[in-house]
A protein has these predicted regions:
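Conserved coupling segment at the C-terminus of the helicase ATP-binding
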Residues: 2-16, 20-188
Length: 188
């Protein structure tokens, strides 16, 4: 309802006028899009093993947690390999782009079979890794509330924050590659 009690007719009985319609594409992409910067992603994935090794000695008395860390590191390594493979593929398209910000829009949103296949692999690997990171975050959350936990609270808090950063990075990674691996159906 609009001010004064005016009620709009049903949408199918309306004519829509988009002022600033030339911005509609960019606005839709910002609102519904997903992105990850490949080089930044590779940088934090490559830094992750060193960060894990720094935390491992602090948590060696917690067997469950200390067993999780090498698994998280291995999965991050596999993910790094896959994301590294994406860089040269996507760079080819960026080199074709005339967009000032170095962006490329795929015609009709179709990224092609090669990128779609790689995206599927990255999605599967990221999904599994995300699950491990969620378990790590839950374990650290429980450790924070355990007064008898053998690690000082400030160390747990620091690692909890770091794990949260990894988790949010993995979620962003998954959001993008999950969208890219799905083949568009005709008319979408």
């Amino acid at each position: 309802a609009l001010g004064g009690g005016a009620i709009l007719p049903p949408p199918e009985d309306c004519i829509y006028i988009f002022d600033e319609g030339h911005r509609l594409g960019d606005t839709a992409i910002r609102h519904f899009g997903a992105e990850c910067k490949i080089n930044s992603t590779l940088t934090w994935l490559e830094r992750l093993p060193k960060q894990l090794k720094g935390q491992a000695p602090l948590f060696d008395k917690d067997t469950a947690l200390s067993e999780q860390l090498p698994r998280i590191e291995r999965e991050a390594g596999k993910l790094t390999e896959l994301v590294s493979m994406a860089y040269p593929l996507l760079k080819e398209y960026l080199d074709l782009s005339d967009h000032a910000e170095g962006r490329y829009r795929f015609a009709h949103g179709d990224v092609g079979a090669v990128i779609r296949d790689l995206a599927k692999q990255i999605t599967m690997k990221t999904s599994g890794w995300l699950g491990r990171l969620e378990v790590l975050e839950d374990t650290l959350s429980e450790a924070l509330s355990d007064r008898e936990y053998p690690v000082p609270v400030p160390d747990i808090e620091l690692f909890y924050q770091q794990a949260g950063n990894w988790l949010s990075g993995a979620e962003r990674l998954l959001a993008l590659w999950d969208r890219l691996h799905k083949e568009l159906k005709k008319g979408e």
